[in-house]
Amino acid sequence: MAAATLGQVWARKLLPVPWLLCGSKRCVSSIFKAADLQIQMTKEPQKKPAPSQALLFGKTFTDHMLMVEWNNKAGWGPPRIQPFQNLTLHPACSGLHYSLQLFEGLKAYKGGDQQVRLFRPWLNMDRMLRSARRLCLPDFDKQELLECIRQLIEVDKDWVPDGNGTSLYVRPVLIGNEPSLGVGMVTQALLYVILCPVGSYFPGDSMTPVSLLADPSFVRAWIGGVGDCKLGGNYGPTVAVQREAQKRGCEQVLWLYGPDHQLTEVGTMNIFVYWTHEDGVLELVTPPLNGVILPGVVRQSLLDLARTWGEFRVAERKVTMKELKRALEEGRVREVFGSGTACQVCPVHQILYEGKQLHIPTMENGPELILRFQKELKAIQYGASAHDWMFRV
């Protein structure tokens, strides 16, 4: 895509990102540019998965990766696409010791026209920069990074799977690479991007609902914390709770917050409730962006689609377990589901809360809304329905 065209598109999509007090303003004048991108092609290309081969999430990687290094004296070095390889890190690397690291996750889809498109990557770039500033990691130009990612996908375009529900998962990462045991702002950092061909979250056209453990003794995030940033430190501590959920016969965790047991997230997904509110109005509601939950790209997309339809009320506000239990008792709940890049939309059919199993009638109701969201998203992502959410590679 020509630079001028990319700039026009970006101008329509760009969201403001406020400075934090610790934001590394010293880095603003130092940006890497896609025009300086260096490309080194692999001499040992891997065998690509067969079309019939099952693609497990995050297990298969493409031939190349994007790498950009930064230090506080020279700023950003030139970006380079190079053969996929292991990293060499100092044993005292601050990204390993103090979780000074963040990541993103987005997908590229191959349409029936064989055109590859990224789904709303501008939102991922915005979120990535917000996360970087929260950790005092160096700033970068979102437009330039997106163009570098586009060129990386173009180099490995033959890895983009062509099949129903398949995609190329894109994982940008930014880590502090300080070779010191001191805790503070880094003087070295590393940004890299790797690619994974992935299959459908739900095999075929099936849609398997999940059961949730809702235990208020476990907390994922809190007001004033970093729950709204995509940091590695938000994910590692959830593994033990996920294991506890499995011990209790549940697939995922419903994260609660506060003394009133507010619904926040499902596993690593945002959560939605489709119900008739106590005021008698049909409504789709999801928790607000108050700093506790991650501002998901699919979350925003579902809200945008629902508001475009104009068929029911769409709300972003606090929802408590007390409200959900009452609505279930009164038969007002239609569907409960999670949303995220991996699954798009995932139905919920059961919640274990305070020692009792709460049945959610999601599947008995179609799930009508979930299937509609899935259909609309798929049409947009695979190019059957033209939409300015998609960024052509």
UniProtKB/Swiss-Prot annotation:
Residue range of the transit peptide in the UniProt record, numbered on this chain: 1-27
Keyword Iron: no
Function: Catalyzes the first reaction in the catabolism of the essential branched chain amino acids leucine, isoleucine, and valine. May also function as a transporter of branched chain alpha-keto acids.
Catalysed transformations (reactions): L-leucine + 2-oxoglutarate = 4-methyl-2-oxopentanoate + L-glutamate; L-isoleucine + 2-oxoglutarate = (S)-3-methyl-2-oxopentanoate + L-glutamate; L-valine + 2-oxoglutarate = 3-methyl-2-oxobutanoate + L-glutamate
Record GO terms (molecular function): branched-chain-amino-acid transaminase activity; L-isoleucine-2-oxoglutarate transaminase activity; L-leucine-2-oxoglutarate transaminase activity; L-valine-2-oxoglutarate transaminase activity
Binding positions (substrate): 169
Record's subcellular location: Mitochondrion
PANTHER family, alphabetized: BRANCHED-CHAIN-AMINO-ACID AMINOTRANSFERASE, MITOCHONDRIAL, SUBGROUP IIII AMINOTRANSFERASE
Name of the protein in its database record: Branched-chain-amino-acid aminotransferase, mitochondrial
Cofactor: pyridoxal 5'-phosphate
Source organism superkingdom: Eukaryota
Gene3D superfamilies in the record: 3.30.470.10, D-amino Acid Aminotransferase, subunit A, domain 2
InterPro entries from the UniProt entry: Aminotrans_IV (IPR001544), Aminotrans_IV_CS (IPR018300), Aminotransferase-like (IPR036038), B_amino_transII (IPR005786), BCAT-like_C (IPR043132), BCAT-like_N (IPR043131), BCAT_family (IPR033939)
GO cellular component annotations of the record: mitochondrion; nucleoplasm
Family stated for the protein in its record: Belongs to the class-IV pyridoxal-phosphate-dependent aminotransferase family.
Gene Ontology BP annotations: amino acid biosynthetic process; branched-chain amino acid biosynthetic process; branched-chain amino acid catabolic process; branched-chain amino acid metabolic process; cellular response to leukemia inhibitory factor; isoleucine catabolic process; isoleucine metabolic process; L-leucine metabolic process
Chief subcellular location: mitochondrion
Keywords: Acetylation, Amino-acid biosynthesis, Aminotransferase, Branched-chain amino acid biosynthesis, Lipid metabolism, Mitochondrion, Pyridoxal phosphate, Transferase, Transit peptide
This enzyme's EC code(s): 2.6.1.42
